[in-house]
Design a protein with these regions (language model features):
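Structured alpha/beta or helical-core interaction and ligand-binding surfaces enriched in interleaved
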Residues: 1-158, 163-191
Length: 191
């Protein structure tokens, strides 16, 4: 078992994940719950963003990261991330200048996109994933196997919740989200 030693308290453990079809079915839901906020960024902040704009973006990213960590913790689960968890076939975007961004390099250095990992609620890599997903550099989703639930942070500063068990999970998630000012949860239906 490979253990990555830079991130988190318990570190990421490489795992052999077998429930790929179960996960893929969740992405075909006609309606999902979404954790969203009062503010919105499309792909992060602009290259010429002021320090105030960056501060605002990162404070929001931190709120979302804390909510996601709290969901993993409150549900008493570990999250699976990696090559078999994701709506997109690629886990990283393809920008020519990606390697000039520290946030991307920090994630790419520790995350092998050809593997799956089990992470705990307190693993610091969650912060890097949220930042990179919000900035449109990565497309890494979190799967909680006990509840057959996917948490997908998007480049639109929101987290989609895919599940077959909304009745069982949503009230607890609403309580978690409600503890963070400026964030809320809503239901979206797709055509």
């Amino acid at each position: 078992m490979l253990i990555l030693q830079k991130f988190g308290i318990d570190y990421m453990n490489k795992v052999n994940f077998k429930d790929i079809e179960k996960v893929k079915k969740l992405y075909h839901k006609k309606g999902v719950y979404v954790i969203t906020g009062e503010k919105y960024w499309d792909g992060g902040y602009d290259i010429d963003a002021s320090l105030d704009e960056k501060l605002q973006f990162y404070s929001y990213a931190k709120k979302y990261s804390d909510v996601l960590k709290n969901i993993i913790y409150q549900f008493g689960d570990k999250a699976i991330i990696g090559k078999d968890i994701g709506e997109k076939s690629d886990l990283f975007a393809h920008w020519k200048d990606m390697k000039c961004y520290d946030s991307f390099n920090n994630l790419n250095e520790q995350f092998n996109k050809k593997s799956n990992y089990e992470i705990n609620h307190n693993d610091e890599i969650i912060d890097y994933i949220i930042e990179n997903n919000f900035r449109y550099f990565s497309f890494i989703d979190f799967y909680l196997p006990k509840y057959n639930m996917i948490l997908q942070a998007t480049c639109h500063t929101e987290i989609f919740i895919y599940s077959d068990n909304y009745k069982e999970i949503i009230s607890k998630i609403e309580t978690i989200v409600g503890s963070e000012s400026e964030l809320n949860i809503k239901y979206l239906e797709f055509d």
